[in-house]
Amino acid sequence: MVGEQPNIGDLVSQEEPSVLDLNCYEDIPAEEEESEYPYAIVLPCGLCDQLLRLTCVSDLSTLTRLEELLLGSLRIVCPLCAIRHQRH
């Protein structure tokens, strides 16, 4: 821009836009895709609400399924409630 006021020539570029390929062509080795992660879980007991701490090690897809189960109807109970409510 030359001067205090911009003119249309300053704002419009005379160059043609170029097309950029934004696809990622990186190859990820299979061992990285299926690597296992330690995952800490803190949740209340399904019967007495005492906090439980679990650690799982699995691949990401299995951990995602576990999360869906825990957010659904699956309830984990503490050892004391497991003994108290054990069916004989």
From Swiss-Prot:
UniProt xrefs under SUPFAM superfamilies: E7 C-terminal domain-like
Annotated Pfam families: E7
UniProt xrefs under InterPro entries: Papilloma_E7
Keyword Glycosyltransferase attached: no
Residue interval(s) of motif Nuclear export signal: 63-71
GO annotation, cellular component aspect: host cell cytoplasm; host cell nucleus
PTM entry text: Highly phosphorylated.
One GO biological process term: symbiont-mediated suppression of host innate immune response
Location(s) in or outside the cell: Host cytoplasm; Host nucleus
Record bears the keyword DNA-binding: yes
Gene3D superfamilies: 3.30.160.330
Region E7 terminal domain, annotated ranges: 1-37
Known function: Plays a role in viral genome replication by driving entry of quiescent cells into the cell cycle. Stimulation of progression from G1 to S phase allows the virus to efficiently use the cellular DNA replicating machinery to achieve viral genome replication. E7 protein has both transforming and trans-activating activities. Induces the disassembly of the E2F1 transcription factor from RB1, with subsequent transcriptional activation of E2F1-regulated S-phase genes. Interferes with host histone deacetylation mediated by HDAC1 and HDAC2, leading to transcription activation.
Protein family membership: Belongs to the papillomaviridae E7 protein family.
Protein name: Protein E7
Primary gene name: E7
